[in-house]
Amino acid sequence: EMCIRDSSAADLLTYLYFEEMHIDPENPKMTDRDRFVLSKGHIAPGLYATLAQRGYFPIEDLKTLRHVGSYLQGHPDMKHIPGVDMSSGSLGQGLSAAVGMALSAKLSHEDYRVYVLLGDGEIQEGQIWEAAMFAGARKLDNLVVIVDNNGLQIDGAIEDVCSPYPIDQKFEAFNFDVINISAHNFAEIDAAFKMARQTKGRPTAIIAKSIKGKGVSFMENQASWHGTAPNDEQYARAIEELEKVGEALCQK
């Protein structure tokens, strides 16, 4: 399976798991670990690939994605997948779960941080803003919300379906410190998460402007690829383009 819905957040997931979060793949349930909630659970393959590369489970297991009997199903399952802190897939609920984790840390006087990745179409759900209101009111400065702002959802452009813009001003209204970045610029990603760590007395929202299908020319910014699998020829072409992107990154 290969869907463009995962690629807009690939750089963000890479930074979180390899640079930002305090985690230990050999001890995935350690009590002081940072927590991550993939609220847009339908990009599970991207999360699974990141977890496998980080050492939570064998990379070979990725080939069992959505097979009968596999623990790697279409949405993350905290009961069966090492490194997954919250089951997700029903859009709009992940921020509430993350807020609960962040509040728990405050009440227990623990130092772990909580990160949650939202889709920009997902924030059309009202529950997102109830959770945001609570997080801001409780000054949860151990919470970082990341919005994958690729501008598209399964039915088309988010502006045509139900525009959530201006996203940054909405989070600011709920007492968030807001940072606007490119989701594909590691220098900006790094600076944003460092800034979030320094912010006290309010949660942080990182609005990450991204490109759906990033790295594959014929898939970029095409909502029609949201849940569509490529044929063999398209797959080969996509892999060829992505390998070139990877080689270019390694040379930097």
Q: Across the structure, where does each feature detected by a protein language model lie?
A:
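Short, small-residue-biased leader/transition segments that mark boundaries at the very start
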Residues: 2-4
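Glycine-rich beta-alpha junction loops
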Residues: 11, 42-43, 47, 150-151, ...
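Hydrophobic alpha-helical scaffolding
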Residues: 37-40, 157, 161, 179-182, ...
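Structured core elements
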Residues: 37, 144, 180, 205-207
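Glycine/aspartate-rich loop-and-adjacent alpha/beta segment that forms the canonical ThDP
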Residues: 186-252
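Cofactor-binding active-site loop characterized by glycine-rich and histidine/acidic residues
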Residues: 8-137
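Short secondary-structure boundary/capping segments
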Residues: 54, 161, 220-224
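Thiamine diphosphate
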Residues: 83, 87-90, 95-198
